[in-house]
């Protein structure tokens, strides 16, 4: 990978991409969701641990189950979005490490320290959420990530009896650009970065 992306590709992924709150009625297919995951799973994670898990909420019945856990400002946009991805992390992600990282006994790194396992899973599932956003943009989809929801309620409703724990939500679909607000400011390099 020695060549920079084209200006149009950078515009799609970063410069012109926006967070959407209003959605067109164009559906997102199951095949598209599979295509998204095929890209997300290739993104790097610590020791290839891949703790992120995705539950794609697509049906009216499933959306109704999610609705009570949403903060009030996130209800309408989530009910309207074709897909809401519950980005979760698997608290037992290390069970797959003999396959995912066969070069060492990486499983033991995490079974010996639950705190390290949880921190690793949460951090890396957050990283994978970023990959999902970029994969959506690359495939022509828009996103609206959210952290305004009751994690305990989501876990009880969707993940009871499993090792999955929710991290954040990402609405996915085709955004209504006419309802976008002006882009908010971003921090300048001097305010957010340092070189030593």
From Swiss-Prot:
Gene3D superfamilies: NADH Oxidase (3.40.109.10). The keyword RNA-binding does not apply. Its EC number is 1.1.1.298. Its cofactor is FMN. It comes from the Bacteria. One of its GO terms (biological process) is uracil catabolic process. The keyword NAD applies. InterPro entries: Nitroreductase, Nitroreductase-like, Nitroreductase_HadB/RutE, RutE-like. It holds the Pfam family Nitroreductase. Belongs to the nitroreductase family. HadB/RutE subfamily. This is Probable malonic semialdehyde reductase RutE. It comes from Cronobacter sakazakii (strain ATCC BAA-894) (Enterobacter sakazakii).
């Amino acid at each position: 990978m020695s060549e920079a992306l084209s200006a149009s590709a950078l515009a799609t992924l970063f410069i012109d991409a926006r967070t959407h709150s209003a959605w067109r009625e164009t559906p997102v297919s199951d095949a598209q969701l599979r295509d998204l995951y095929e890209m997300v799973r290739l993104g790097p994670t610590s020791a290839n641990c891949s703790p992120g898990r995705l539950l794609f909420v697509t049906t009216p019945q499933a959306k109704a189950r999610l609705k009570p856990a949403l903060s009030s400002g996130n209800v309408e946009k989530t009910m309207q979005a074709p897909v809401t991805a519950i980005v979760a992390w698997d608290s037992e992600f290390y069970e797959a490490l003999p396959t995912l990282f066969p070069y060492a006994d990486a499983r033991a790194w995490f079974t010996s320290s639950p705190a390290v396992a949880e921190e690793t899973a949460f951090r890396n599932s957050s990283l994978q959420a970023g990959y999902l956003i970029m994969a959506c943009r690359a495939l022509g989809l828009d996103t609206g990530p959210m952290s305004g929801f009751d994690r305990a309620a989501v876990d009880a409703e969707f993940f009871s009896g499993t090792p999955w724990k929710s991290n954040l939500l990402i609405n996915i679909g085709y955004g209504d650009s006419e309802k976008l607000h002006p882009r908010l400011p971003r921090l300048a390099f001097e305010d957010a970065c340092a070189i030593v």
